[in-house]
């Protein structure tokens, strides 16, 4: 079976627009919901929300490729790139590179796409990699560009991309298509359709020696932001990483055909799920503000330190709940004081308690906001 780029009609993708239309409508409605919800977050908390969402995307787009990053280094790099106050935590090369790319995608979403845009992102992502022949430029090697798995002597070829000699021509056509399908151009496409096509189309050209997956997801984010007319804070990579195997299965299946309806349906549903993740995260920030409105004045320094530490874990809090041992480790206080502090927090309605004795666990009591 030929690869999609070997089919004579390439790159004329076929799809049933009527199957995607209801999902496009949901996307626009949810985009409005997110915008409305964010308005209920205070300006200072909005900064932290942006950092949290961008760092999640940076961490997860790397994790999809099997690369684990240091979260604190990513967040420190993001704050520096956005001109916000930051700590002196060292920015490591990989973390700095992906943070730099995420901020560029976020800040310059409205700019037209060019080869130079992609070269810039690629340099940001991979300037630390001494093993690559071509950084910040399209691949030039003569070897076949294959995605393989399995052992060295019995590899499974999942996809073979066009040869390097074809890349500049393919990318000229791709960049032209991307810009002409934007909302204010000659052939505008709906948001989810355009983002889904741009992801699959770019992945199928595979123009760089490495980093193509991360760049294709960045392109999808840029595309969505252009269609909604503002920077996208959709948790796309975060959501894809949950279903990493299915994601790769979908890509592989649709790199052998130009009929991409099922790819677009899957991608659209994934974006809609990503929007819900973002809405939940925004809701968490609103609930956090309400929590502090109710309880801040009553918290002693130890309690405030622990509450802040729990909030830092995000919407799920401590895995398995906060234990008395956690409280002791964070505050370095006596067991009697920790017991008294925790009891006070439960009585005031700041924490709820489950379990007994050494299985006792504590959880933040957050009001679900009905704002927006």
Model regions: which residues?
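FIC/Doc superfamily catalytic core
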Residues: 1-372
């Amino acid at each position: 079976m030929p690869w999609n780029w070997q089919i004579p009609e390439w790159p004329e993708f076929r799809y049933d627009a009527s199957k995607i239309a209801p999902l496009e409508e949901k996307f626009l409605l949810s985009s409005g919901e997110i915008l409305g919800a964010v308005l209920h977050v205070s300006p200072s908390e909005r900064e932290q929300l942006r950092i949290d969402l961008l760092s999640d995307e940076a961490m997860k787009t790397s994790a999809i490729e099997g690369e684990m990053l240091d979260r604190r280094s990513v967040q420190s790099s993001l704050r520096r790139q956005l001109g916000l106050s930051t700590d002196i935590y060292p920015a490591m090369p990989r973390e700095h590179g992906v943070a730099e790319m995420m901020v560029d995608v976020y800040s310059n979403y409205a700019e037209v796409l060019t080869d130079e845009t992609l070269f810039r992102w690629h340099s940001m992502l991979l300037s630390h990699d001494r093993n690559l022949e071509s950084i910040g430029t399209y691949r030039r090697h003569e070897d076949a560009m294959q995605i393989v798995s399995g052992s060295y002597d019995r590899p499974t070829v999942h996809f073979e991309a066009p040869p390097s000699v074809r890349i500049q021509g393919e990318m000229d056509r791709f960049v032209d298509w991307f810009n002409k399908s934007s909302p204010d151009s000659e052939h505008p496409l709906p948001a989810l359709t355009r983002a889904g096509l741009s992801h699959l189309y770019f992945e199928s050209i595979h123009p760089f020696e490495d980093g193509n997956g991360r760049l294709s997801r960045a392109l999808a984010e840029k595309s969505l932001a252009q269609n909604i007319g503002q920077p996208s804070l959709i948790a796309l990579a975060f959501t894809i990483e949950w279903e990493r195997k299915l994601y790769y299965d979908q890509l592989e299946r649709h790199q052998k055909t130009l009929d991409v309806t099922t790819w677009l349906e899957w991608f659209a549903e994934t974006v809609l799920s990503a929007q819900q993740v973002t809405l939940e995260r925004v809701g968490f920030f609103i609930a956090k503000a309400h929590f502090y409105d109710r309880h801040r004045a009553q918290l002693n320094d130890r309690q405030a330190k622990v509450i802040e530490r729990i909030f830092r874990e995000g919407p799920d809090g401590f895995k398995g709940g906060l234990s008395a041992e956690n409280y002791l480790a964070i505050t370095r206080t006596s067991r009697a004081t920790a017991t008294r502090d925790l009891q006070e927090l439960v009585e005031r309605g700041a924490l709820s308690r489950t379990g007994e004795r050494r299985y006792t666990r504590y959880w933040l009591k957050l009001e679900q906001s009905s704002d927006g």
